[in-house]
């Protein structure tokens, strides 16, 4: 009887861990973005983005690099620009890994010429030709949502309008190594 109790003490945690794992729970895994379900691959979907110079955005780059897509709501102005600047700063804070992240802005850029010029320092400006990303574009004026895309074109996380840039940075540090 005593041996059975000892075996149960060791088996019970394994059974609980197995049940939690089977139910999909993962310890300590908490991202700031929302998972994109069902999973989307922009290469497989042939999602076309036309850049300002007329070229197409290459989802699969010559080097494995992530893409952060910023999707602007209507009338990108002060708040929108502040968020975009925060994202560009977060990219710089990746230090030696900042070259592993490309920044792509889709939508109408800010009307202010100074802000537009400042933006083009860090961001590639383009547009979603077929509107396949329309579901992720915020409806709120002067806002931005973001989508983090893996180097193979798989969309990982959605950061809806109003997201916190430090949370985005924490997630990027976890996945961009």
Spans of features found by a protein language model:
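Membrane-entry signal-anchor segments at the cytosolic-membrane interface
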Residues: 1-8
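Extracytoplasmic
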Residues: 63-66, 98-100, 141
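Conserved helix-turn-beta segment immediately C-terminal to the redox Cys motif
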Residues: 22, 84-104
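Thiol-/selenol-based redox modules, centered on thioredoxin-like
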Residues: 142, 148-177
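Short, surface-exposed patches at the edges or C-terminal ends of soluble domains, predominantly
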Residues: 55, 88-90, 131, 170-177
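Short active-site neighborhood of thiol/selenol oxidoreductases, capturing the structured segment around
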Residues: 60-87
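N-terminal "domain-start" segment that seeds a small globular fold
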Residues: 8, 12-15, 24-60
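Short, internal strand/loop/helix patches
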Residues: 102-149
